From Swiss-Prot:
Source organism of the structure: Bacillus subtilis (strain 168)
Pfam families cross-referenced by the UniProt entry: Terminase_6N
InterPro entries in UniProt: P-loop_NTPase
Stretches of the chain forming a coiled coil according to its record: none
Protein name: SPbeta prophage-derived uncharacterized protein YonF
Lineage: Bacteria, Bacillati, Bacillota, Bacilli, Bacillales
Domain of life: Bacteria
């Protein structure tokens, strides 16, 4: 009770000395600095356990439910694989995760690799966008660069994010966290012998130096992101490895999320998806891999194997239509003329009315480049249209013939193709170009040549009239050409996009024009999907017959197969010209 009797001055309190062993009331009271550090420690532990809450409460970024789950799994597993459909914001989510990891775990070294350096740089660009909307993130970042050769993010706490090219030149880097975006596009040898070697010593915070915390060592992490691909590819085996390890309870996580979740969360427009699926050149195989997060495996009866074709995707620069070269103002981007001895073909599979299954016209340009054994076949251009009038198609063939300086036309002259042949045998007036074309005639079939009433018409058309024996030979020759590497085809769309980005002016083009450039690469992907869908049936005499699944097409296959067959005919003629006559007495001297 407080009263004057109990009141004591400080002087009288210590009149009998100070007991230094007596603890005062504030003995356990911590300083402001100590309380601050305790609070930081508590919140850090909480946010490390709940990284999705850190994104919302500290960074001020709102996540969808599936994104919360993915962020959580990224932080709490050593190995993570995310197979995403288009439209889920995979790159954006990766950039958010990188910021979370870098802030909550000071001193973290993050390396991002991809099929191309440009793709990896997109993560840095997304972080640049994020910091503009998040004041706390902006305060955490010390330096950020998005330049091609030095893209990086440095944080005040010592963490950093850098990008590397997926090649042998990336050796000697060091990291605690490796992220490989579009990992299916990276060579497995590069991942195993170069990129994974970055992960040497794990993050070593100072508290590990204390004996009571020495057991809390951290592990390095690996994160792989992509869409699904073909089962014959190494990435599928990697997926199976991750799945089996996850099911055994190891610190592995793998998931595939289809396009429906992007629609549900408002990230993808439902009507847009319907429109794409209703397009006449809709590719169900590509759709299942890219949008449904499903791996595709060719059937046991498939005549063409994916790996035999894919290994020949080596042409970075196809031949674009000549007028495209004026759209990019770069002196290094120019049309490639013929080489000495080169022959060019435009090979065609003709369709009739639009709207029918298995019914599309395909025009393919071949470059036959001489080598010591004959010709290398380069498929440099392909376009497809769904049906059309015979006169219109004949005019388009003549346009391509002129544009690419072709020497021969290869044409299936059965059924609808016969009408196109007859149109080519007549003078053609091109209204679009205000030009008249001279008539052409057949070079390899006298009966077909007789249909041309112009005696002086140049003989440049190779007529193809399929039958069981010829169709079998054509299929065998095409399969052999791909297996032996005699046929070269353009690289995939993603690699093609990165190739085009090298040229000044490409980035400034409209999306529609960019799409026209990329179609030269996309057509080859559609060709591959057609070919690996073809199943073989063998007759008693050993002939092969190829059958496409119901409602599927093989127009691109036919166009390419016809062109390759005539290339073989020309190659045999070339080799015959160079052979010695065994009866020539000069041979013996």
């Amino acid at each position: 009770m407080t009263s004057h009797k109990n009141f004591t001055t400080d002087r009288n309190k210590h009149s009998r000395g100070i007991n230094i062993f007596k603890k005062g009331n504030n003995f356990k009271k911590k300083s402001k600095s100590e309380r601050l550090m305790d609070g930081i420690g508590a919140w850090t532990s909480f946010y490390r356990a709940n990284p999705h809450r850190f994104v919302k409460e500290y960074l001020g970024i709102t996540l969808k439910l599936f994104q919360c789950i993915l962020i959580y799994m990224m932080v709490h597993n050593h190995y993570f694989m995310y197979l995403a459909s288009r439209g889920q914001g995979k790159t954006w989510l990766t950039s958010v995760y990188c910021c979370v990891q870098a802030i909550l775990f000071p001193g973290t070294k993050i390396v991002i690799a991809s099929g191309t350096k440009g793709q990896a740089r997109e993560v840095i660009e997304k972080i640049d966008d994020l910091r503009k909307e998040s004041p706390n993130l902006r305060r955490e970042i010390e330096d950020l660069k998005t330049s091609t050769n030095d893209a990086k993010v440095e944080f005040h706490n010592g963490s950093w994010i850098k990008i590397v090219a997926s090649n042998d030149g990336a050796r000697s880097k060091r990291a605690n966290l490796l992220i490989v975006d579009e990992f299916r596009m990276v060579d497995f040898e590069i991942i195993s012998k170069v990129l994974r070697k970055f992960l040497t010593a794990p993050r070593s915070p100072k508290y590990l130096e204390k004996e009571e915390y020495a057991h809390l060592k951290e592990r390095n992490k690996e994160i792989y992101l992509s869409s699904c691909w073909y089962k014959v590819h190494w990435s599928f085996n990697r997926f199976i490895t991750y799945y089996n390890a996850m099911m055994k309870g190891s610190k592995y996580f793998v998931c595939g999320l289809p396009y429906q979740i992007a629609i549900k969360e408002g990230l993808l427009d439902k009507d847009q998806v319907r429109d794409e699926m209703a397009e006449e050149d809709f590719d169900p195989i590509g759709w299942s891999m890219e949008m449904e997060a499903l791996w595709f495996g060719e059937s046991e009866k498939a005549y063409f194997k994916f790996e035999d074709i894919e290994k020949n995707r080596k042409l970075a620069s196809p031949l674009f239509p000549p007028d495209y070269y004026s759209l990019i103002k770069d002196s290094n981007f120019k049309y490639e003329g013929k080489k000495p001895g080169e022959i060019r073909l435009v090979s065609n599979d003709i369709a009739g009315m639009a709207g029918k299954d298995n019914d599309a016209s395909v025009y393919t340009v071949f470059r036959l480049i001489p080598n010591s054994n004959g010709y290398d076949r380069h498929i440099v251009y392909m376009e497809s249209i769904v049906g059309g009038h015979t006169g219109t198609q004949a005019t388009r063939i003549r346009q391509i013939y002129e544009d690419y300086d072709c020497d021969y036309i290869v044409l299936d002259t059965q059924s609808i193709g016969l009408g196109v042949y007859d149109a080519l045998c007549q003078p053609l007036y091109d209204k679009e170009r205000a030009k008249e074309y001279e008539p052409f005639s057949c070079i390899n079939d006298e009966r077909m040549a007789a249909r041309c009433t112009y005696q002086n018409a140049e003989k440049v058309i190779y007529s193809i009239k399929g039958n069981a024996q010829l169709n079998s030979e054509i299929a065998v020759l095409l399969k052999d050409g791909f297996k032996r590497g005699k046929i070269k085809i353009p690289i995939n769309e993603n690699e093609g996009k990165e190739y085009l980005k090298r040229f000044k002016g490409y980035e400034g083009l409209s999306p529609e024009v960019k799409g026209k450039f990329l179609s030269s690469y996309a057509q080859i992907t559609l060709l591959i999907n057609e070919m690996i869908n073809l199943e073989a049936e063998y007759s008693d005499n050993g002939q092969v017959k190829l059958k496409e699944p119901k409602s599927k097409r093989k127009d691109r296959y036919s166009s390419v197969a016809y062109g390759n067959y005539i290339a073989t005919v020309l190659e045999r003629q070339l080799n015959k010209q160079t052979e010695y006559d065994v009866e020539d007495e000069l041979v013996y001297f």
